[in-house]
């Protein structure tokens, strides 16, 4: 068959026919597009001329308005210019951000119409794309290499620099140019400027903003008039610009202007438009965006937010006032502390005079520092301890030269001279000095015959020196010097006037306590607050220092938790814990269970020593049977009888548990079987160890058992909570009947003892 051929002429004619048909159909539907474009362009030009604004012109307007509101003297100057010349020319060069150009969106039909009108309905085919790719490849092959391009760029840069230098020399050219701001940056600056006028942001103070500061303060005044506030909102929000009403309800003619085609796309678009129209019409009286949650108040009084920081300023004033009051209180407490310190120093001086110790242990440093209870106790113990009060109390002081006082006077009962006696002694001394005549019995009497008494009397200093020299001489020379002096040093000290003891006066310790109480950490509600120390009962928790140091942390926590040692409790609770831990410390078995590491070391050493004296298995079984028989015999005895020595450890455990559980109910007597078994195993192991230590254990003697002993054991009952239970029944539940029996026995004894004590108390009353 021959190849198929296409008639190209017929194809071209048919294609032209289809294009004309499509063009006519579009014209019938949309009308003449050229006329509409011309009319629309004229309308848009008129709208743009109305909307276009200049931001510099707005700033000049705000500046002049601020000067007018302020009544600045610049207004009355003849040469004052409120609008710069640049604003007139800048409006044509730069388009403001606020101007909105009405640009019609392009749809698919518009694009097809454009292709039909401009290109005759021809689209770019694959052949043309291949041709473009081949052309690009040819251009790339003819282009220079990378090195050649770099050289060309360097040469062009050199030429440009040389030309720019020549132009700079002439004064016309400029190598560096000012960077032009983008439209986004300009819009952002304009928005910041408007927000600054609204009072919502702060900007750097520039010369341009100084003149407009008054206008900003005027508009942000909360007491602004309604008319002025309306003018402010109208100017700042640019209410004079007409905005497109997006939610405008279209008319019926606008909706039905386009004919509905049979195609699915146009039918769907018509349905969407119909639904939108119905929705807008039905909800025309409701608020827009009613389904969204508003993050701002619905009814805004003014669009410009005014700062209302009255509460903040009030809080700051209150805070400052409280800080000042706190400082005044601290200053007053410091002054009080200084006065108290001066009072204590006066007391110290008096103590130095009375005690004769001029170097006491207290200094200014001790009083200036912070209060330390341990240091305070050490100082008080050092100065006023047992040594201070016990000093010179072992023997009564004796003076050799005071015979006249020792014979007839008891100085221990001396209270002090009264006022009349002191005046009499003073007068007597004064008269004696006036009518003094030398006597041979006086110690200062001169035996020289050539001595002239009319000469000047000896000075007091010389007399003191002579007395000191006489004291230095030995006792053998004393009788040769004549009679002793009348008054000794002790008598002079006693004769001095001293303050009588006042029981109402505070002690030195009380003064120090008051001084240290003036210290404080903080002042809360005009009250100085300080940390108070608290006395706590000393408690070792039933452990020695070696046990505490050698035991592990887990073992110590099992004995007594760390939380319990740090609890804040009353003195009564502390004493109860002290008593309980003392009882707990006596239980050696409990300690062995808790402190395993301590007792394992001792047991290991003893086992190494006693490895020779081990007992065989058969003998151990015999000893166990003998012990069991002894236990069964002792249980048949009366209830008042004491438990056998083999069960002393078990009884001690019961005592400890009963002492801690005195308030436990009688019904809570059931003990788990596992605990019973562990207690019995510990007792048996202990007995085995005692037996193993003996090299040749003696076989225990068999005691005469009563007939029917086992029957008696089985038939014996245990009373618990007012009921009787057989031993077999308790054993069936996994309980130890012996343990329960002794527990009830000790409870009865305790009750009887309490009754006897009550009766004794009543009898004493």
UniProtKB/Swiss-Prot annotation:
It comes from the Eukaryota. Coiled coil: none annotated. Residues 614-623, 698-711 have a biased composition (Basic residues). Residues 20-56, 82-192, 292-334, 387-484, 603-648, 662-711, 746-765 are annotated as: Disordered. Residues 85-100 have a biased composition (Polar residues). Residues 20-32, 101-123, 149-162, 181-191, 305-334, 424-436, 466-478, 624-633, 683-697 have a biased composition (Basic and acidic residues). One of its GO terms (cellular component) is 90S preribosome. It holds the Pfam family Kri1. GO terms for biological process: definitive hemopoiesis; endonucleolytic cleavage in ITS1 to separate SSU-rRNA from 5.8S rRNA and LSU-rRNA from tricistronic rRNA transcript (SSU-rRNA, 5.8S rRNA, LSU-rRNA); ribosome biogenesis. Belongs to the KRI1 family. This is Protein KRI1 homolog. The gene is kri1.
């Amino acid at each position: 068959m021959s190849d198929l051929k296409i008639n190209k002429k017929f194809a071209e004619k048919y294609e032209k026919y289809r294009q004309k048909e499509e063009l006519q159909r579009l014209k019938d539907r949309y009308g003449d597009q050229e006329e509409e474009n011309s009319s629309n362009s004229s309308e848009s030009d008129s709208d743009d001329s109305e909307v276009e604004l200049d931001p510099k012109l707005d700033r000049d307007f705000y500046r002049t308005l601020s000067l007018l509101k302020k009544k600045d003297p610049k207004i009355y100057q003849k040469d004052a210019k409120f609008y710069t010349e640049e604003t007139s020319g800048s409006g044509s060069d730069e388009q403001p951000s606020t101007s909105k150009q009405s640009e019609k969106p392009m749809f698919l039909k518009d694009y097809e119409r454009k292709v039909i009108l401009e290109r005759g309905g021809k689209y770019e085919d694959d052949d043309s794309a291949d041709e473009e790719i081949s052309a690009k490849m040819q251009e790339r092959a003819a282009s220079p290499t990378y090195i050649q391009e770099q050289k060309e760029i360097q040469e062009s840069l050199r030429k440009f620099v040389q030309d720019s230098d020549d132009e700079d020399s002439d004064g016309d050219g400029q190598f560096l140019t000012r960077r032009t701001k983008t439209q986004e940056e300009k819009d952002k600056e304009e928005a910041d400027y408007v927000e600054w006028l609204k009072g919502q942001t702060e900007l750097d103070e520039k010369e341009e903003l100084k003149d407009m500061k008054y206008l900003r303060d005027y508009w942000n005044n909360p007491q602004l008039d309604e008319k002025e506030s309306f003018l402010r909102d109208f100017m700042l929000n640019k209410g004079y610009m007409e905005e497109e009403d997006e939610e405008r309800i279209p008319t019926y003619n606008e909706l039905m202007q386009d004919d509905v085609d049979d195609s699915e796309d146009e039918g769907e678009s018509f349905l969407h438009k119909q639904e939108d129209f119905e929705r807008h019409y039905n909800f025309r009286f409701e608020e827009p965006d009613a389904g969204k949650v508003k993050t701002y108040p619905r009814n805004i009084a003014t669009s410009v937010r005014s700062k209302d920081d009255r509460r903040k300023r009030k809080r700051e004033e209150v805070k400052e006032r409280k800080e000042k009051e706190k400082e005044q209180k601290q200053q007053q407490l410091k002054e009080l502390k200084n006065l108290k310190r001066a009072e204590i120093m006066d007391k110290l001086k008096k103590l130095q005079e009375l005690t004769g110790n001029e170097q006491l242990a207290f200094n200014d440093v001790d009083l200036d520092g912070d209060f330390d209870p341990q240091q305070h106790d050490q100082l008080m113990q050092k100065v006023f301890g047992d040594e201070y009060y016990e000093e010179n109390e072992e023997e009564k002081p004796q003076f050799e030269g005071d015979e006249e006082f020792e014979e007839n006077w008891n100085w221990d009962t001396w209270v002090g001279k009264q006022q009349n006696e002191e005046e009499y002694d003073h007068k007597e001394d004064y008269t004696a000095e006036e009518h003094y005549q030398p006597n041979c019995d006086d110690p200062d009497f001169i035996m020289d015959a050539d001595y002239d008494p009319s000469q000047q009397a000896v000075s007091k200093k010389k007399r003191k020196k002579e007395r000191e020299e006489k004291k230095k001489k030995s006792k053998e020379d004393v009788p040769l010097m004549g009679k002793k002096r009348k008054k000794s040093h002790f008598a002079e000290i006693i004769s001095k006037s001293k303050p009588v003891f006042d029981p109402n006066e505070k002690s030195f310790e009380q003064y120090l306590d008051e001084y240290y109480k003036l210290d404080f950490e903080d002042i809360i509600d005009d009250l100085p607050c300080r940390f108070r120390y608290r006395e706590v009962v000393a408690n070792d928790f039933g452990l020695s220092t070696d046990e505490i140091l050698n035991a592990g942390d887990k073992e110590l926590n099992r004995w007594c938790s760390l939380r319990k040692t740090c609890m804040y409790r009353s003195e009564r609770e502390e004493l109860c814990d002290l008593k309980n831990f003392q009882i707990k410390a006596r239980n050696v078995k409990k300690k062995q269970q808790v402190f395993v590491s301590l007792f394992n070391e001792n047991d290991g050493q003893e086992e190494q020593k006693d490895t020779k004296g081990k007992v065989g298995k058969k003998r151990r079984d015999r000893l166990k049977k003998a012990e069991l028989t002894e236990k069964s015999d002792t249980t048949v005895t009366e209830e008042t009888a004491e438990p056998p020595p083999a069960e002393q450890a078990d009884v001690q455990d019961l005592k400890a548990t009963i002492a801690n559980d005195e308030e436990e109910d009688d019904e809570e007597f059931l003990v788990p079987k596992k605990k019973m078994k562990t207690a019995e195993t510990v007792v048996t192991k202990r007995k085995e160890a005692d037996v193993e230590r003996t090299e040749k254990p003696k076989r225990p003697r068999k005691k005469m058992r009563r007939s029917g002993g086992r029957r008696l054991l089985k038939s014996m009952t245990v009373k618990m909570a007012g009921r009787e239970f057989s031993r077999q029944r308790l054993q069936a539940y996994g309980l130890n009947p012996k343990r329960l029996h002794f527990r009830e026995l000790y409870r009865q004894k305790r009750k009887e003892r309490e009754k006897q004590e009550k009766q004794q108390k009543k009898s004493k009353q």
